[in-house]
From Swiss-Prot:
Binding locations of Zn(2+) 1: C67, C69, C82, C85
GO MF term set: DNA binding; DNA-directed RNA polymerase activity; magnesium ion binding; zinc ion binding
InterPro entries reported for this sequence: DNA-dir_RpoC_beta_prime, DNA-dir_RpoC_beta_prime_bact, RNA_pol_asu, RNA_pol_N, RNA_pol_Rpb1_1, RNA_pol_Rpb1_3, RNA_pol_Rpb1_3_sf, RNA_pol_Rpb1_4
Name of the molecule in the record: DNA-directed RNA polymerase subunit beta'
Binding site residues for Mg(2+): D499, D501, D503
Residues binding Zn(2+) 2, per UniProt: C867, C943, C950, C953
The enzyme's E.C. designation: 2.7.7.6
Similarity annotation: Belongs to the RNA polymerase beta' chain family.
Organism, scientific name: Chlorobium phaeovibrioides (strain DSM 265 / 1930) (Prosthecochloris vibrioformis (strain DSM 265))
Length: 1484
C-alpha cells in the first residue's frame, strides 16, 4: 500500500500488496521529522513537547486548523506552516497518519530477522544464532576483512575474536590502522550491528547461490545438504526480491500525476543490509495515545515507554561518542541501545522482557500489537464495530409471520432516528433538525406514525452470538411493539439456536440501497428455509407445534360419528363444530387428487364399518375406485394448510414427517408457499397443543410389572458369571465384560417393555408417549430412566481408552419415578456433573476447530463454470453402511454432476448421461435399481480449476437446490457446515445424565431379513467339545480372518446385507441356506481375539518361560492359575531376545504351524498338550469402548483427522501386494517380510508386543495393515495415492459425525476442506526450473514452473554462439534453432543442447493449521497464527499478496471477491440501444 508524500493514504484501487524490508531511505521518506527528545507532553500546559514523541511540528496539530503557538487559527490558513512554531495548519486527523523517525547513533539489528527460526541473518552469513548473538551484543569481534595481518596469523573472514586476540593483532600491526578501510590489505574486525551491517553489505548473493547449489549437487553428507538447502532458500528469497534498477513507473500504477513516482517508492528489492537499521520509524501518535484520566493523571500506551527508552539510550550514546568515552562504556551503551530496540519491536520474545513499574507485566511491543486475538489483525481489521445497532432480550412472537420480527418502539426510534428526522422536516411537521429531535424526545404521537412509514419495507438484521453459520444472521421486516424485548418467530429459533431463557440478540440496520436489497432478497428469513450443510429444512416445527400436529392427525377408533361419509372439507368442519364427529374420528371424504398415505384403507375398513352391510359394500367399491379416502377429522383440518399441489396428507404427522413434508414443499412449490404453510401449521400446532390439554403427570409414567422378574433374572445371570470366574474358566476382564453385558441387556429389555406399555396406554393417547413418539420432547433413553431402570453408569475418566472399569458394574436398578437410594443417587451424580463440565470445556475446542477450518478454506470460491476435467470420484453402493444407518447411496450422489453415464448393468439402460446433474428423482431411481453398484461423479477433489473451484465439480447449492453460482464462497460455507455441528458434538453427554448406553457386545449375530446365505473368503474347521453340562457339542469354527457372509435376495440376487465374520466365530448356518429374519447366523466372543489351532498335533512352547515371558497369576478368590504373557524386555540383558510363540508339532517332532503370542495374552493350553482343529490355545483381551454417549472421543477424533496427525500407535501397512513371511527376531522388534511374484521384497520391523494381524503365508494387498492400530493417513497417501487418502478422510470424518451425533453433513463440504489439505506438493528434483529441492509449493505453481521450461533447452556446448550465451544456460528452443541455422550457413560450430529437465514432486498431506499458514496470501496467514514469522518470511522474499481470498480483502477494507463483489462485475459495462428521449410536454 502506497502513502503519498504528506497527504492521506491513497484511496487507490490497488489490486495487490507487496511486502518488503524498509530501506533506510524509505524510512526517512515516510518520516516528517526526527524525534530528538523522550518527552511526550509538558507537565504544566499538557501540550506536546517540541521534538518529543508527540511533537506537533512532526506529527501535525492537536486541534483542527490551529498551530501550536496559536498564531494561525481557522480553516482559511489551510496548508500554511507557522513561521514561529513550524506546525502545519491542517486537521488533527493527520496525527493518525504522519510518522517520525529516530536516527540511531550506531546501526542496530532488527530482532525479527535475527531471532526468527531459521535466523535470516544467520543463514546468509553461515553463523549460528548463538554466535550471532555474541557479535550483536558486543561480546566478540567478527573479522570483516582479514587483510595481511590476518593472513599471517591464519585468520579468515567471519572468524570470531575475543577482545584480547583483537588487541594483540592491533598492537602487533600498528601501521594497519593507517590504511583506508576499503584497502584489501587492511585487517578489519568489528562487533555489534555495525559489523553485521558491513558483512551483509559486502555479501555477494549470486556467488553464495552458486556455492550452495554446488554443495547440494556434489556433497554426499546429508547434514551438509540440509544446511545448504536451508541457507539457499533465504539467499534465493533475497535474490528474487532484489532486481536492481527496476523502477515502478507511472504506467503500472496510474496513481501519480508526474512522469515518475516519488523517490521513496522506487522499489529495487530487498538488500540484505536492510535487516540492520540506521533509523527507526516512529508510528503516528494517535496510534499510541496519551489518554487523560480523572485526577490529572494520564494513561499511556506501552509503546511510548519503549520509544522513550530507545531515545534516552540513543541520546546518551551520542553524547558519549562526542566526548570520546572509553570503548568499554561505549560498548555497554551500544548493547543497551540494541536491547531497547529489540524490546520495542518484539518484547515478548526476550527472556528478560521490559516490564511495567506497577503491575510488573511485560510491555506490549509493536509485534504484540499485531499478534493474537487482541492484535491489530483480529481485533480491528477482521472484527469492526458498527453503528446503527442495538441489542435486547428476545421473547417469543407466536402471532408474527415468518418474515417478521417485533422491534420495541424505543429501539426502533433510536435506530431509525436520522430517517425519522428527515421525514419530519420534509413533511413540515418540524422546522429544523433540532425541533424534530425535541419531538422525538417528547414521544409525540405523530412520531410513531412517521416511524411506521419509515420502517415499512426496510429490513433489519437480527444476529445471535455465537454466529456459527450463516443462518445466525437473518433479515426480518420489523413490526413495532410495546415493551423492551425483541419478538422472534418461533420457527427461526432452530437456525439461531435460540431459546427464550434470557438469550439476547443484536439488531443491525442495513443503510445503503444495495444492502437493503441484499437483505430483502438473500437474507430474509422466509428465503432461508434450507440448511446449507445438508440440504434439509431448518425451519421445522418443534415442541408444542409438533405435539399439536401429532395430536391433531392421530386417529382413535370408536369415536363419535365413526364411519360417516362427507362430500367436502367444509361439511366435515361444520359437523365437527356441531360436535357430530370427534377430532380423532375415522371418517370418509370425497377426494380424487394425489394422496400421501402409508396404510391400506381396505384393511382398516372392516374395523370402521361392520362387514357385510350395504354401507360396507358401497364404501369398498368407492375406495377401490379411489373416489373416497378414509381419514380423520383432524387430518382434514391439517390439510386446509397444505397446498393443493402436494395432495392430501393422510398420515400421522410427527417431527420427522413434518421435516420431510417441508423439504418436499420447498422443492415443489417454492419458498413463498412454504413460508405460508409454515405460518399456518404454527398456528394449528399451538392451538391443538392447547386444545388437547397435553401435560405430564406422574401417573403417566408407568413402570412395567415384569421389571422385578427381569432384574431377578439378571442377578441370577451375574451370579452364574461370578461362579464361572471362581471356577477359573473366566479371567477378571471377561467376568467384568459379561456382567456389564447382562445388565445392559436387562436394562434394554425393561426399557422396551415400558415403552410398549406406554404405547398401549389410553390407545396411544398417553401424553408422555405422545411427546416421545411425535419427537416433540424427550427420548427413549429418558423414558427408560423414568419408567424402566437407570441402568449402568459411566465412571468419569479423563482418557477414552476404554479400559475395563470405565462403567461401574453395579447398575442403578431404581428408576426416577420410584426414586433412587442415597448410594444410587451418589453414583449418578458422577456422570451428571461430568456432562456439565465437559460442555464448557469442549465448546472452546469446537470454536478453535471452526476457526482453523475457516482459515484454511476461506479462499475457495466458485470461479468458473466448468474446469473441463475428465476425472471423477467413484462412489460405491456400500451395503454395510446403508444397513448401519449411515448416509445412503442416493444421498451421496444427489445434486452432483455425473462424470460418466450411469448405466443399469442388468438392462443396459442409461439412467443419467454424463455431464448432467443427478436430481432427487434420479437419485431415488438409482437407489432402487439393483443394476447400479457405482456412480462416477464430478467432485471438488478432482477439480482442475487453477484458482478456486468450478461449478460442475461442486454440483448443486444445497440451500436452493440449483447449480452453484459463480462467486459463491463455498469454502466458508463448508467451514460453517462442519464447525457448527462440531459445537453440538461437544454438548452430548449432558442430556444422558452420564448413563452408559451402547457398547452391548453382541455374542450372536442374526439375519436382518430373510434371504440366502453366501460365503465369501470363509475357511472353517469342524470341532467337538464337552460343554458345562458334560454333553458333547459339535461346532463349525471360522479360522480365516476378515471372512464375510452375504445375505442375498433369493429372487433378484441382490446383496441385502454383508456381515464380517470374526476369527474364531461359531457358524450356525451353511452356504446356500435359506434363513428367516432374526435367525442366528454365527456367534462370536466379543471381548477377546482368539488364537485357534488349525491342525492336529502337540503343543510346544517356544520362548514361553515362567517369570521371563509369562507370569502366573493365582486368583485369590478362585485359587486358579492364569498364565499371562508379559513384556519381557525389562527382564533380559540388551543382547538377549525372546519371541513367545506356540508351535504345533507332529509325532516326529517336526513343527507344522507357529503362532506368535502377543503381550497380555492369556494361555489356555499347557506345554505338551494335544490339540485338535478348533481348540482355543490363547485369548488376547480386546478393550471395548463402552461409554457410547460421551462425545469426548468424537471431537478429538475429528481434529486428529483434519490435522492429518499420525495416530499414537499406528498400524504398520504393507506397500506392495504379496505374501507374508516372518524373518529373524531382534531384541525389541521382529521382521515381517512381504514378497510379491516379481521377486520384490519389503521388510517391516514390528515392535515386540504389537499384535500381528497377518499369519505366515497370508496374501496381502498394498495398503493392508499388518499389525493392529489405526492406519496413518500419511501411509495411505504414500502407498495408495492422493485419491485414496482424500476418500479415507472424508469417510472417517463422516463416521464420527454420524455415529456420535447423528449429524448429517453433505460430503461436498468435507471434500472442500480435504482438497485444501492436499493443495501442496514437495519438490523432489527441481530439474532446470527455479524451484529448490524440498520446496513446499502450490500444485498450480509447480505446474506453471514446469510449463515455463517446457519450450526451453539447456546449452551443453556453446560452439560459436554469441558471448552472451554460456554453457548450462537455458534458452528458448526456437531461438537456438534459428541461431544454429545461421551458424551452419556461416560454416561455424553449432550449439549443442538438450531438452530442459522438468521438476518432479510428490503430493503432501498438510493438517488444516499448516495448510492455513502455507496459504499463498500473506495477510491471511499473518492474521491466523505465527504473525511475526509469516511477516518476516514475506518481507525477506518480497512476497506479493494478490488479494484473492475473502480474509485479506476484509482486512484491507475492500469488497470480498465473492457474490456481487467478483471482479468481473466491477468491470461490467452496459452496452445497449440508447433510449429514445421522451418528448417534452407542451404547455397547456
Amino acid at each position: 500500500m502506497i502513502f503519498s508524500q504528506g497527504a492521506s493514504p491513497l484511496k487507490g484501487d490497488f489490486s495487490r500488496i507487496k511486502f518488503s524490508i524498509a530501506s533506510p531511505e524509505s524510512i526517512l521518506a515516510h518520516s516528517r521529522g526526527e524525534v530528538l527528545k523522550p518527552e511526550t507532553i509538558n507537565y504544566r500546559t499538557f501540550k506536546p513537547e517540541r521534538d518529543g514523541l508527540m511533537c506537533e511540528k512532526i506529527f501535525g496539530p492537536t486541534k483542527d486548523w490551529e498551530c501550536y503557538c496559536g498564531k494561525y487559527k481557522r480553516v482559511r490558513y489551510k496548508g500554511i506552516i507557522c513561521d514561529r512554531c513550524g506546525v502545519e495548519v491542517t486537521t488533527k486527523s493527520v496525527r493518525r497518519e504522519r510518522m517520525g523517525h529516530i536516527a540511531l547513533a550506531v546501526p542496530v539489528v532488527h530482532t525479527w530477522f535475527f531471532r526468527s527460526v531459521p535466523s535470516k541473518i544467520g543463514a546468509l552469513l553461515d553463523l549460528s544464532t548463538k554466535e550471532l548473538e555474541r557479535i550483536i551484543y558486543y561480546e566478540v569481534y567478527v573479522v570483516i576483512n582479514p587483510g595481511e595481518p590476518g593472513e599471517k596469523q591464519g585468520i579468515k573472514k567471519l572468524d570470531r575474536l575475543t577482545e584480547e586476540q583483537y588487541f594483540q593483532i592491533i598492537t602487533e600491526f600498528e601501521d594497519n590502522q593507517d590504511l583506508d578501510d576499503s584497502d584489501p590489505a587492511k585487517f578489519v574486525a568489528k562487533m555489534g550491528g555495525e559489523a553485521i551491517h558491513l558483512l551483509l553489505r559486502n555479501l555477494d548473493l549470486d556467488a553464495s547461490a552458486v556455492h550452495l547449489r554446488t554443495i547440494l549437487k556434489e556433497s554426499s553428507s546429508e547434514q551438509k545438504r540440509a544446511d545448504a538447502l536451508k541457507r539457499l532458500k533465504v539467499v534465493e528469497a533475497f535474490r528474487k526480491s532484489y532486481e536492481p534498477h527496476r523502477k515502478v513507473r507511472k504506467k503500472s500504477t496510474g496513481l501519480f500525476p508526474e512522469d515518475e513516482m516519488p523517490e521513496p517508492y522506487i522499489y529495487e528489492g530487498n538488500k540484505p543490509e536492510y535487516m540492520v537499521m540506521e533509523a527507526i520509524p516512529v508510528i503516528p501518535p494517535e496510534l499510541r495515545p496519551l489518554v487523560p484520566l480523572e485526577g490529572g493523571r494520564f494513561a499511556t500506551s506501552d509503546l511510548n515507554d519503549l520509544y522513550r527508552r530507545v531515545i534516552i539510550r540513543n541520546n546518551r550514546l551520542k553524547k558519549l561518542i562526542d566526548i570520546r568515552a572509553p570503548e568499554v562504556i561505549l560498548r555497554n551503551e551500544k548493547r543497551m541501545l540494541q536491547e531497547a530496540v529489540d524490546a520495542l519491536f518484539d518484547n515478548s520474545r526476550k527472556a528478560n522482557a521490559v516490564k511495567t513499574g506497577e503491575s510488573n507485566r511485560p510491555l506490549k511491543s509493536l509485534s504484540d500489537s499485531l499478534k493474537g486475538k487482541q492484535g491489530r489483525f483480529r481485533q480491528n481489521l477482521l472484527g469492526k464495530r458498527v453503528d446503527y445497532s442495538g441489542r435486547s432480550v428476545i421473547v417469543v412472537g407466536p402471532e408474527l409471520k415468518l418474515h417478521q420480527c417485533g422491534l420495541p418502539k424505543s429501539m426502533a426510534i433510536e435506530l431509525f432516528q436520522p430517517f425519522v428526522i428527515r421525514r419530519l422536516v420534509e413533511r413540515g411537521i418540524a422546522k429544523s433538525v433540532k425541533s424534530a429531535k425535541k419531538l422525538i424526545d417528547k414521544k409525540d404521537p405523530v412520531v410513531w406514525d412517521v416511524l411506521e412509514k419509515v420502517i415499512d419495507g426496510r429490513p433489519v438484521l437480527l444476529n445471535r452470538a455465537p454466529t456459527l453459520h450463516r443462518l445466525g444472521i437473518q433479515a426480518f421486516q420489523p413490526t413495532l411493539i410495546e415493551g423492551k424485548a425483541i419478538q422472534l418467530h418461533p420457527l427461526v429459533c432452530t437456525a439461531f439456536n435460540a431459546d427464550f431463557d434470557g438469550d439476547q440478540m443484536a439488531v443491525h440496520v442495513p443503510l445503503s440501497q444495495e444492502a437493503q436489497l441484499e437483505a430483502s432478497l438473500l437474507m430474509l428469513s422466509s428465503h432461508n428455509l434450507i440448511l446449507p450443510q445438508s440440504g434439509k429444512p431448518v425451519t421445522v416445527p418443534s415442541q408444542d407445534m409438533v405435539l399439536g400436529m401429532y395430536y391433531l392427525t392421530k386417529s382413535r377408533s370408536g369415536g363419535v360419528g365413526e364411519g360417516s361419509v362427507f362430500y367436502s372439507r367444509e361439511d366435515v368442519l361444520i359437523a365437527h363444530n356441531e360436535e357430530r364427529v370427534g377430532l380423532h374420528t375415522q371418517i370418509f371424504i370425497q377426494h380424487t387428487g394425489r394422496i400421501d398415505q402409508k396404510f391400506d384403507p381396505l384393511r382398516v375398513l372392516d374395523l370402521v364399518v361392520e362387514p357385510g352391510t350395504e354401507k360396507h359394500t358401497w364404501l369398498k367399491s368407492q375406495l377401490e375406485q379411489k373416489k373416497l379416502i378414509l381419514t380423520t377429522v383432524g387430518r382434514v383440518i391439517f390439510n386446509e394448510s397444505v397446498p393443493d399441489e402436494i395432495g392430501f396428507i393422510n398420515r400421522v404427522i410427527d417431527k420427522k414427517g413434518a421435516k420431510e413434508l417441508i423439504g418436499r414443499l420447498s422443492s415443489e412449490v417454492g419458498n413463498v408457499e412454504t413460508a405460508r404453510f409454515l405460518d399456518n401449521i404454527k398456528q394449528v400446532g399451538f392451538f391443538y397443543a392447547m386444545k388437547g390439554g397435553l401435560s405430564v403427570s406422574l401417573s403417566d409414567a408407568i413402570v412395567p410389572e415384569t421389571k422385578a422378574k427381569h432384574i431377578k433374572g439378571a442377578q441370577r445371570d451375574s451370579t452364574r458369571v461370578v461362579k464361572e470366574y471362581n471356577r477359573g474358566t473366566l479371567t477378571d476382564n471377561e467376568r467384568y465384560n459379561q456382567i456389564v453385558d447382562v445388565w445392559q441387556k436387562t436394562s434394554n429389555i425393561v426399557a422396551e417393555e415400558s415403552y410398549q406399555i406406554l404405547k398401549k396406554d389410553r390407545a396411544g393417547f398417553n401424553p408422555l408417549y405422545m411427546m416421545l413418539d411425535s419427537g416433540a420432547r424427550g427420548s427413549r433413553e429418558q423414558v427408560r430412566q423414568l419408567t424402566g431402570m437407570r441402568g449402568l453408569i459411566a465412571r468419569p475418566q479423563k482418557s477414552m481408552s476404554g479400559q475395563p472399569g470405565e462403567i461401574i458394574e453395579n447398575p442403578i436398578i431404581s428408576n426416577l419415578k420410584e426414586g433412587l437410594t442415597v448410594l444410587e443417587y451418589f453414583i449418578s451424580t458422577h456422570g451428571a456433573r461430568k456432562g456439565l463440565s465437559d460442555t464448557s470445556l469442549k465448546t472452546a475446542d469446537a470454536g478453535y476447530l471452526t476457526r482453523r477450518l475457516h482459515d484454511v478454506a476461506q479462499d475457495v470460491i466458485v470461479t468458473m463454470e466448468d474446469c473441463g476435467t475428465t476425472r471423477g470420484l467413484l462412489i460405491y453402493r456400500n451395503i454395510e453402511e446403508e444397513t448401519s444407518g449411515q448416509i445412503k447411496f442416493r444421498e451421496k450422489i444427489r445434486g452432483r454432476v455425473t462424470a460418466r453415464d450411469i448405466v443399469d448393468t442388468i438392462t443396459g439402460n442409461v439412467i443419467v448421461p454424463a455431464g448432467e446433474t443427478i436430481t432427487d428423482a434420479h437419485a431415488e431411481l438409482i437407489q432402487d435399481t439393483p443394476g447400479v453398484e457405482e456412480a462416477e461423479i464430478r467432485s471438488v477433489l478432482t477439480c482442475e480449476a487453477k484458482q478456486g473451484i468450478c461449478s460442475k465439480c461442486y454440483g448443486t447449492n444445497l440451500s436452493v437446490h440449483k447449480p452453484v453460482e459463480i462467486g459463491e464462497a463455498v469454502g466458508v460455507i463448508a467451514a460453517q457446515s462442519i464447525g457448527e455441528p462440531g459445537t453440538q458434538l461437544t454438548l452430548r453427554t449432558f442430556h444422558q445424565g452420564g448413563t452408559a448406553q451402547g457398547g452391548i457386545s453382541e455374542t450372536e449375530t442374526k439375519a436382518v431379513n430373510e434371504g440366502t446365505v453366501q460365503f465369501e473368503d470363509i475357511k472353517t474347521v469342524d470341532h467337538s467339545a464337552i460343554n458345562e453340562d458334560g454333553v458333547e457339542e459339535d461346532s463349525v469354527i471360522v479360522i480365516q480372518k476378515n471372512g464375510k457372509i452375504n445375505l442375498v435376495d433369493s429372487d433378484s440376487g441382490k446383496v441385502l446385507k454383508r456381515y464380517v465374520v470374526p476369527h474364531g466365530a461359531h457358524l450356525a448356518c451353511k452356504a446356500g441356506d435359506l434363513v428367516r429374519k432374526d435367525q442366528v447366523l454365527f456367534s462370536s466372543e466379543p471381548n477377546s481375539t482368539q488364537i485357534i489351532a488349525e491342525i492336529n498335533g502337540t503343543i510346544k512352547f517356544a520362548d514361553i518361560e515362567k517369570g521371563v515371558t509369562y507370569k502366573e497369576e493365582v486368583d485369590p478368590q478362585t485359587g486358579f492359575a492364569q498364565h499371562t504373557i508379559i513384556n519381557w524386555r525389562s527382564k533380559l540383558r540388551a543382547t538377549e531376545t525372546r519371541e513367545p510363540r506356540l508351535m504345533i508339532v507332529d509325532e516326529t517332532g517336526e513343527v507344522r504351524k507357529t503362532y506368535p503370542v502377543p503381550i497380555k495374552s492369556n494361555l489356555y493350553v499347557e506345554d505338551g498338550q494335544k490339540v485338535v482343529p478348533g481348540d482355543i490355545m490363547a485369548k488376547v483381551p480386546r478393550n471395548l469402548d463402552r461409554s457410547g454417549g460421551d462425545i469426548t472421543a468424537g471431537l478429538p477424533k475429528v481434529t486428529e483427522l483434519f490435522e492429518a496427525r499420525i495416530p499414537s500407535d499406528p498400524a504398520i501397512v504393507t506397500e506392495i501386494d504379496g505374501y507374508v513371511s516372518f524373518g529373524s527376531q531382534r531384541r525389541s522388534s521382529k521382521e515381517i517380510k512381504v514378497k510379491n511374484d516379481f521377486g520384490e521384497e519389503k521388510v517391516y520391523y514390528v515392535q515386540v508386543g504389537k499384535h500381528v494381524l497377518a499369519n505366515e503365508g497370508d496374501e496381502v494387498k498394498a495398503g493392508d495393515p499388518l499389525t493392529d492400530g489405526a492406519v496413518s493417513p500419511q501411509d495411505i497417501l504414500r502407498i495408495q495415492g492422493p485419491n485414496a487418502v482424500q476418500q479415507y478422510l472424508v469417510n472417517e470424518i463422516q463416521k464420527v459425525y454420524q455415529i456420535n451425533a447423528g449429524v448429517e453433513i453433505n460430503d461436498k463440504h468435507l471434500e472442500v476442506i480435504v482438497r485444501q489439505m492436499l493443495q501442496k506438493v514437495r519438490v523432489e528434483e527441481p530439474g532446470d526450473t527455479e524451484m529448490l529441492p524440498g520446496d513446499l509449493i502450490d500444485r498450480s505453481a509447480f505446474l506453471e514452473a514446469n510449463e515455463s521450461v517446457a519450450e526451453k533447452v539447456r546449452i551443453t556446448e556453446r560452439g560459436d554462439a554469441p558471448a552472451r550465451m554460456q554453457d548450462e544456460e537455458l534458452q528458448k528452443l526456437r531461438d537456438i534453432t534459428k541461431l544454429n541455422r545461421e551458424l551452419r550457413k556461416n560454416g561455424k560450430v553449432m550449439i549443442a543442447y538438450e531438452p530442459a529437465l522438468q521438476g518432479t514432486s510428490h503430493p503432501v498431506l498438510l493438517g488444516i493449521t499448516s495448510a492455513a499458514l502455507q496459504t499463498e496470501s500473506v495477510i491471511s496467514a499473518a492474521s491466523f497464527q505465527e504473525t511475526t514469522k509469516v511477516l518476516t518470511d514475506a518481507a525477506v522474499a518480497g512476497k506479493v499478496d494478490h488479494l484473492a481470498g475473502l480474509k485479506e480483502n476484509v482486512i484491507v477494507g475492500k469488497l470480498i471477491p465473492a457474490g456481487t463483489g467478483l471482479k468481473k462485475y466491477k468491470t461490467l459495462r452496459l452496452i445497449g440501444e440508447p433510449e429514445a428521449e421522451a418528448p417534452a410536454k407542451e404547455d397547456a
